[in-house]
Regions:
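A short, solvent-exposed beta-strand micro-motif common in secreted/extracellular proteins
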Residues: 80-91
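Repeated scaffold domains used in trafficking and secretory/extracellular systems
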Residues: 214-222, 255-263, 296-305, 363-379, ...
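Primarily secretory-pathway and cell-envelope proteins
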Residues: 19-64, 89-212, 219-223, 291, ...
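Beta-strand-rich domains and repeat architectures in extracellular enzymes and scaffolds
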Residues: 204-236, 256-259
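Conserved Ser/Thr-centered positions that define the repeating blades of beta-propeller domains
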Residues: 240-242, 280-281, 346-351, 394-396, ...
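Entry beta-strands of beta-propeller and related beta-repeat scaffolds
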Residues: 226-230, 266-269, 307-311, 381-385, ...
């Protein structure tokens, strides 16, 4: 309950970002220039700049009209001619930020940055050089290009790593007691700082280090016959785990987040959050693009069996007004504008995916989706299972028929054991949580006892054995607990705890339970003891 309250407190504490008034470029070009900046992996909704030598703050919070790419945020605004310095990114103070010049009737490109969490509640802004940057800047100014004195943008100055920016504590607005609770929680749960990242001064060296410590972003890896696992990760990486627990990296020429991976017949296929599918036939040394599905379609799953390729993508369609960042109401718990999430399942028979086509689309209202973890797609015994919102769906590959297989009105998580075919479903709702399993591919369900809440993951391996993790909330912190199903008691036994600030991840019954720490270290559970497999320190 306390974690839910904490989430509500944080939600209400998020500052409201006002959209700037629309401006007529034709009336401004004589005295103003346009400043453009982008953040490849999302932003803070506002860039704060100040005239050089002045403490006056100017907020740039208008969305630039550029082609959408996954979570990228692009902003720009008209500023009076003069010299400026970037002084803030949302609530973060950007010390010694980059300086730039604004000239009448010109566009100034401030560059592209990625905010990187380096631990200890600190963020470093990493400048990124893109080969197609000029095209993005041109797109941002296309609507008013005819009014410009010179269409060539003024390039960004020296783009350097920012100093580590301290993320401030939350001012809840709910009084002193609430603020003290949040501050204490923040203090005792402070993650370790990645000192190697803080020591890096060169952007290329910093990026190289970031790629080596990025954690898996998906729970389903690609598995080789010898037990080697490939996990999707951020910054164009796959985290490779050998059977003996050694971790290394396989990378490709992209900074996007890799969100899916599959291994088949000596090939590795990956999907990214900007809709690209790539393949490697040499273990990840070289990569070729197989398909481009659209820059707003995240590829969340790639599966193969019996001559079928299945690809699951997710696309958000938001009624977003071009030229302004949508501002949530401070009194609304849910988004004030309905958002439709389109989950698409694509199918192909050819190895090169040339015949990839839509098999099914689910249009889901995000306001009706409760704690959705993603589609959790799995291909097992000729059946493709997908959690579409809160409803489990199953595709029979042989017949091409879809069937909804809900054990109840809503489902929070869906798991299928690839060896036994047992399906498990969880509805997480505190004391009202429900657990079900099925031995017949979801046609019928049996309800069993549940672990203590808050339940995060639950996997039944057979009708009489299973594993679960829960977040046990203490007074000012919490611990991840592990549970094993006891059929005699129809209940769950507490069998251990995860290390501090470490989230458990279970691939299967055949792989040791892993744990991903907030400082990017990785542990494994062997013979009841946690062992360090990868240290980011």
């Amino acid at each position: 309950m306390r974690s839910w309250m904490l989430a509500v407190v944080v939600l209400f504490a998020v500052p409201c970002i006002a959209s700037g008034a629309s401006k007529d470029p034709a009336k401004l070009v004589a005295t103003h220039g346009y400043a453009y900046m982008s953040f490849s992996k999302g932003g803070q909704d506002v860039l704060v700049v100040s005239p050089v030598g002045s403490r006056r703050e100017i907020r740039i919070d208008l969305a630039a009209d550029v082609p959408p790419v996954a979570k990228m945020q692009a902003i720009g605004d008209w500023l009076p001619a003069g010299s400026y310095r970037v002084t803030g990114w949302g609530p973060l103070t950007w010390k010694d930020g980059p300086t730039f010049e604004i000239k009448p009737g010109r566009v100034t490109d401030l560059g592209d940055y990625v905010g990187v969490d380096v631990g200890g509640y600190k963020t470093v802004m990493l400048p990124i050089a893109h080969p197609d940057r000029q095209e993005a800047v041109a797109a941002a100014s296309r609507s008013f290009a005819s009014t410009l004195v010179d269409p060539a943008p003024i390039p960004a100055g020296s783009m350097a790593l920012s100093p580590a920016m301290e993320r401030p504590g939350i001012n809840t607005g709910l009084g002193l007691v609430a603020d003290l609770l949040i501050a204490h929680d923040r203090k005792i749960n402070k993650p370790s700082t990645l000192n190697a990242l803080l020591a890096a001064k060169d952007p290329d060296a910093f990026l190289g280090l970031v790629r080596t410590v990025t954690l898996p972003t998906q729970e389903e890896p690609a598995s080789l016959p010898d037990g080697t696992l490939y996990f999707p990760a951020d910054f164009g990486q796959l985290r490779k785990r050998s059977p003996d627990g050694h971790w290394s990296n396989v990378g490709m020429d992209t900074l996007r987040q890799i969100t899916a991976v599959e291994a088949h017949d000596g090939r590795l296929l990956t999907g990214s959050d900007d809709g690209h599918i790539r393949e490697s036939r040499d273990g990840g040394t070289t990569w070729n693009e197989v398909a481009a599905l659209g820059s707003k379609q995240s590829v969340l799953d790639i599966d193969h069996a019996d001559g079928y390729w299945l690809v699951t993508t997710l696309e958000n369609t938001d009624p977003f007004k071009e030229g302004a960042i949508r501002v949530p109401s401070p009194l609304a718990v849910f988004p004030i504008v309905p958002r439709t999430v389109r989950l698409r399942i694509l199918m192909a028979r050819q190895a090169d995916l040339a015949d990839l086509k839509l098999a099914r689309e689910f249009a889901m209202d995000i306001n009706e989706m409760w704690a959705w973890p993603g589609p959790q797609s799995q291909l097992v015994n000729g059946q493709y299972y997908v959690l579409a919102g809160n409803t489990p769906q199953r595709l029979d590959l042989a017949s091409g028929q879809w069937k909804a297989i809900p054990p109840r009105a809503r489902t929070s998580t869906l798991r299928v054991n690839p060896r036994t075919g047992v399906v498990s479903a969880l509805w997480g709702q505190g004391a009202f949580s429900k657990v079900y399993y099925s031995n017949d591919q979801g046609d019928t369900w049996q309800q069993i006892g549940r672990p203590p809440y808050v339940i995060w993951d639950l996997q039944m391996d057979t009708a009489t054995s299973g594993w679960a993790s829960r977040w046990n909330v203490n007074a000012f912190s919490g611990v991840w607990e592990l549970y094993s199903f006891s059929p005699k008691k129809n209940d769950w036994d507490h069998v251990g705890d995860a290390p501090f600030n470490c989230k458990p991840l279970r691939v299967s019954a055949e792989v040791p339970v892993l744990c991903m720490s907030r400082d990017s270290s990785i542990f494994s559970l062997r013979d009841g003891k946690w062992n360090v497999e990868f240290s980011a320190q």
